[in-house]
Amino acid sequence: MEKYVVVLAAGKGTRMKSKLYKVLHQVCGKAMVEHVVDAARAVKPSKIVTIVGHGAEDVEKVLAGKSEFVMQEEQLGTGHAVMQAEGQLAALEGATLVVTGDTPLFTSETFEKLFAYHEEEGNAATVLTAEAPDPFGYGRIIRDDQGNVLRIVEQKDGKPEELKVKEINTGVFCFDNQDLWAALKQVGNDNSQGEYYLTDVLEILRKAGKKVGAYKMPDFSESLGVNDRIALAEATRIMQRRINEGHMRDGVTFIDPATAYIDADVEIGNDTVIEGGVTIKVHTVIGSDCLITSGSRIVDSQIGNGVTVTSSTIEESIMEDNTDIGPNSHLRPKSLIKRGAHLGNFVEVKKAEIGENTKVGHLTYVGDATLGKDINVGCGVIFSNFDGVKKFHTTVGDKSFIGAGSTLVSPINVADHAFIAADSTITKDVGKYEMAIARGRQVNKKDYWHKLPLSEDEEWK
């Protein structure tokens, strides 16, 4: 059976009260509609068609290469939205799944089971349903004595006995493709909203003698539709729990899973420990045997094995195996920390390479620089890389020593085995085995104390 997917993503989402198109709001680092499309892609459909309207260009950018797109110029209901895909799908044989783009929690396993059930039962249409703890506001699934689906009753239209039903319509459907397009031609808009409803297709098919069924999924939470910021937060909470539990099953320790915020595309190796209050975003990859402590934030970075990140921020950078950073340090984009290097307290690195086993202890800024291996950088060292117009680069060779409080004014080259005395301002190259001292000579003035204004103060004698 050929599979096709239609994603409805044309609604504006006014209840979000946002300039951002609703389906582009993120849940754990991915737009809601991208979660839906990624789950659909996992069942290997022959074609995915996303119906776009408001913010079409932005949606197409997010889903580039993952879907075809059709514009719904005027939003006239779910049935009308599906009709827009006629040119892409109407001539094809197979089954078509229809899902909305604001339901980010559906899994590929649920979609796969829906397709399989639809095919096994020989249905013309299959509704994805769930048992709701509180079904208020949902369309109820009304079945006959044999369990066949008779109709979907909306909250406002239901009789008291019908509203007691807890099996609800999730808004996801699977149709025989040819039956779908034949029935859509019969859907009208004679209702209070003047819209074309996709649910009318079920009644049309049933009256035509076609089989209409329902597949009840076990996890009601998957069906959560996001229409406002409250639902967005709830979807994020559920997705975050799902992500963190997946990592824990793979051998990652979470000290407090409820406060560890891990994006959907993050990878973490086994025996790594994640403390509470940690944020890891985008496509970050973390190796095995690492420790990420509270207050750390890692964005789109590569972290090797055996790395310790202590309450620090890492952005678009690489830390190789057995390195450590922090507390309270910051790797800015395009930084490379090589194997065994140490970055201590309050160290900021920007677009720089720190060589193997090099130590940058504390209170230091390293920007636009390449440091070799086995270097010791003292406290308070500054790489002065900006003249107000352009950035300049400095290179420091292997096994050099940079004394505390020194400033290296770029561009300069410090050779291997060079020694820079503490509190020096270095503006020229330093050669191999040379020691550079660049500071004012100390002068001690004898008996100068008695010339001070405070010299007569008894407390100062």
Curated annotation (Swiss-Prot):
Keyword check for Transferase: yes
Active-site residues, record numbering mapped to chain: 362
Pathway annotation from the record: Nucleotide-sugar biosynthesis; UDP-N-acetyl-alpha-D-glucosamine biosynthesis; N-acetyl-alpha-D-glucosamine 1-phosphate from alpha-D-glucosamine 6-phosphate (route II): step 2/2; Nucleotide-sugar biosynthesis; UDP-N-acetyl-alpha-D-glucosamine biosynthesis; UDP-N-acetyl-alpha-D-glucosamine from N-acetyl-alpha-D-glucosamine 1-phosphate: step 1/1; Bacterial outer membrane biogenesis; LPS lipid A biosynthesis
Cellular component GO terms held in the UniProt record: cytoplasm; membrane
Record region (Pyrophosphorylase): 1-229
Region (N-acetyltransferase): 251-461
Domain of life (superkingdom): Bacteria
GO BP of this protein: cell morphogenesis; cell wall organization; lipid A biosynthetic process; peptidoglycan biosynthetic process; regulation of cell shape; UDP-N-acetylglucosamine biosynthetic process
Magnesium as UniProt keyword: yes
Region described as Linker: spans on this chain: 230-250
EC id: 2.7.7.23, 2.3.1.157
Compartment annotation: Cytoplasm
Similarity comment: family membership: In the N-terminal section; belongs to the N-acetylglucosamine-1-phosphate uridyltransferase family. In the C-terminal section; belongs to the transferase hexapeptide repeat family.
Full protein name: Bifunctional protein GlmU
Organism: Lactobacillus delbrueckii subsp. bulgaricus (strain ATCC 11842 / DSM 20081 / BCRC 10696 / JCM 1002 / NBRC 13953 / NCIMB 11778 / NCTC 12712 / WDCM 00102 / Lb 14)
Record gene name: glmU
